[in-house]
Amino acid sequence: MWRISRVELENFRSYRGAHRLELGDVNLLWGRIGAGKTSVFYAIEYALFGQQLEVKERVAKLADLIHSGSHEARVALELVDGANVLKVERKLGKRGAEKLVVVHNGVELRGGEAERRLEELLGVDEDLYERLVYISHRTLEGFIYGTSQKRAISVDRLFGIDVIDGVVKTVSSAEKALLGKAEELRKRLAAYEKYRDVIKRYGGYSGLVSRLRALSSEIEALKEREAMLTRTVEELARARAAYLAKLKEHEQILLEYYRARSELEFLESSAGGEVDVGALEKVKAALREAAEEFEHMLDPGILEKLYKASDLEALSVAMAEVYDALTRVAKDLELELTDVKKAYEEYVARARRLEEEVAAAEARLRRLEKPFLRFQELLKKLRSLEEARARLSEARRRLSEAEREAAYYTSLKTVALYLAETNASVCPICGSPISREAVEKVVRDIDEKFGGVVKRVEELREEVKALEREVEEMEILQGDAAEYIAAKARLDELKVEREEVVKKVLQAEKSVRQLEKRIEKLREFFAKVDKRVISDAVSRYGRAVRIRELRKRVKELEERLRQAGIGGEELEVEVKWREAAAELEKAAARLAELYKEKSLLEEAAREVGEEAEGLKKRLDNVLYAYGRLEELKSRLELAKVSARARLVEVVRSRFNEVFQSLYKYGDVVKVDAAVEPSRGYYDFYAISPSGDRYGVSRLSDGQRLSIALSLALALREISQVKLGFLIFDEPIPYVDVNVRKAFAQLLTSLAGRYQLLVATQSREFAEEVREALPNAKLFTVVKDGASALIEGLQS
């Protein structure tokens, strides 16, 4: 592993000029606060990485590494690893220009190639260096004296997972910005609600902005018009002053003339020329025609008012009433058409269902027709099922009698044949003497007399079988026949109902056509005549009448003024002056309105900023992003806790080995580490020889220092850093005797494995190190305007 054999500084931080430091295995720099001890360590870091912690953390700038009053700083290191020698030299100019020279075993490299080769040889980046090589009092102090949270931060820094906290802080900053943006958007949405009516008036926010732009042009144009009218009024006022006395004498006539003429000009300009007085008659005729068409649906008094209207006002009211009545008729017809269409659709649907039912009934009849015809055939033959059953019963009775009779004669014949075959001489029944001839004669008599009985039995049996089949068939077919009759009756009912529904369909269809025709007539009427047309016709008619009256009155007043000595020129000037003054007043009033409107719109535009949908969408996006960041923070915290637990597991074994090699007192035999489940903090426990567990809070400062160093050194060994030196920058900032002694003993243990560089402001600690490590190289750092290095402890 690489060890530093020499450090050279030139115009670096507090060091002016060139300084050289030859290092041994254990090196201790002692000096007061600000003397320049840390500058030596900064020089080592800068030489190796071209960077420095304070610069990276933006506490300082690279240019601050150059001594005040100098233009360039230089740092050089010589590192050895067995036979390998590595020389590194960096120069830094005031303008940030940097030069690097690396010499490895006599091979010189410069620039980017030198940076790459140096990184390869060191095998460590500046982050790992600051965690596991350069151990400052900030790292150890957080573990020794800090709370659980501060201790967690210190250990995280050693593990290298403090970067997660940096990400979390960045995420939190982004969240804060998002919350601010969300609040701004909510205020804009609230402002949108505040100015909703104003925005709606202009058709949305874009319309409001367009109107605001148009207002500026309109205001400028109106201001120019106001200035022009002011000049005109002033000129006319000067011309008017010559005959002002005469004008005042006839002021009342002039005022009346001016009013009449102004009204006449207004009516003529709005009329756009001569008015067709017949337009009102056309509208009236159209209303009368439509009203007569639907007279049966109107109140008779309405038409009478239309016919008898004697003046324009009465006619206007009557026409409006007729129009409203026709509007109601149209609505009633629309409702009636809707009902009739609904009924028509229901009838059509019912007719279709009946067609389907009739078809089903006919199919059922066809299926039952053959069984029914067979049943009818059997009825025709047997008349009825009951009669057939009676005939079957009678045939069975006759068959039974015939079978008994046949059985009797068969028995007699059997006995006679037996007697004949056995040559019996005595009758076995009555005991009378018999002969063979008599017996044979009896057999012949039986055959002659009763031979037909057997034949009759066979015939009766056939008759019974035939009747049984027919009765059974009738019983089976009886249900089908009844079903056929019922189906036929249902079919007849369905056909009758279908005819009635078809009639209703045709009737409803006819009604629909009639209603549509009547509604279409009303639509054609309303397309030509509406309230606006009526009002326009009435107003045009009234305007025409008023124009005639005003023309007549203006001529009369002009004649009176001419007789009073006020001719055309004076009158023209007076009228123009009054018109210009009125226009000027209107322009001023309009300008005030526009300024007021512009002020309101500017305020709304400033507070709202855009359309509500855009604001809502942006707010949703901001809140969604905030939610995702919250989720990311939660996942990062979980990842940090998981990383802590995993790293504790990885380092636990080696951590204890290092601790046991450093801590030789025997009162603590083992240190256990775990991650607290609830908050994710680290828990460190010291275990005594008896197995008792003690939390970090119950340990001494020296014991905590041993744990912190053991953790740092264990991590360093696991990380396989190629640098064989350790730097302790003010590891014990306080002058506690126990802490000094404990750390001096730890240095004794570490000296066998690492090159040590220690900076302290405590002379007592320096003395203890010299006592514990007689071979240690001690340097005194002094400062008198600039820093200087003196070998040995100076008083």
UniProtKB/Swiss-Prot annotation:
Coiled coil: 205-253, 323-412, 450-618
Keywords: Coiled coil, Cytoplasm, Cytoskeleton
GO molecular-function terms, A-Z: ATP hydrolysis activity
Gene3D superfamilies, A to Z: Helix hairpin bin, P-loop containing nucleotide triphosphate hydrolases
Intrachain disulfide bonds: none
PANTHER family from the UniProt entry: ABC TRANSPORTER ABCH.3
Protein name: Arcadin-4
Species per Swiss-Prot/TrEMBL record: Pyrobaculum calidifontis (strain DSM 21063 / JCM 11548 / VA1)
